[in-house]
Amino acid sequence: MSVITFVCAGQMNSAITFPAFENGHEVRLVGSPLDRDIIDGLKKDNFHITLKRTLHDGIKYYQIEELEEALEGADLILGGVSSFGLDWFCDEILPVLPEDVPLLTVTKGMVDLDDGTLVPYPHIFEQRQPEGKHINFNAIGGPCTSYELADHDDSHVAFCGKDMETLKFIKSLLTTDYYHISLSTDVVGVECA
């Protein structure tokens, strides 16, 4: 069993708790400052008010002020910030993440810079991490919605990052008979597809 900490309780990050929990891992879901009502509701009855699904009993829920506790002993961290939360995640979360734990982000797509250059989110995260820090950034791409995943519909995604061994490790934690995962070191290709 591994410990997987999910930072941000949005719909997709919360949906990925299904394969993680069903694979026997300890799942910790931390809400962002905007997720306070979501976490309060989950603590009460496991019902996610925006995903409109009941999460597994046994998931541990944390408010953002409890992030440090939720990160203790984690083997994998999932970042569930939307593109609108990019600056907050880079400024507030990246500095406190342990370097020895891989990060898998659900933020899909690319950032359009002022000069028209398109940059995948993993590259933005890497550029924005604190100086001297070396987090292992990975991302999810592909046609999978939070509802499909939470409902156990067959879904196929790609995990991308620089290190294939890390990607294989992450896949081993999350793959199921309904959540199918391909791996690629072509971050740009996966993120722009």
What does each model-found stretch correspond to?
Residues 1-54, 60-62, 92, 113:
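NAD(P)+-binding Rossmann beta1-loop-alpha1 motif at the extreme N-terminus of oxidoreductases
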Residues 72, 76-153, 171:
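Rossmann-like NAD(P)(H) cofactor-binding subdomain of soluble oxidoreductases
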Residues 96, 128-136, 154-193:
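Internal alpha-helical scaffold of NAD(P)-dependent oxidoreductase catalytic cores
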Residues 57-73:
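Short acidic low-complexity segments
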Residues 4, 26-27, 135-137, 181:
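Hydrophobic anchor at the start of a short beta-strand
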Residues 63-65, 139-141, 183-185:
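Short loop/edge segments at beta-strand edges and connector loops
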Residues 8, 31, 105-107, 141, ...:
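Short beta-strand/turn micro-motifs composed of small residues
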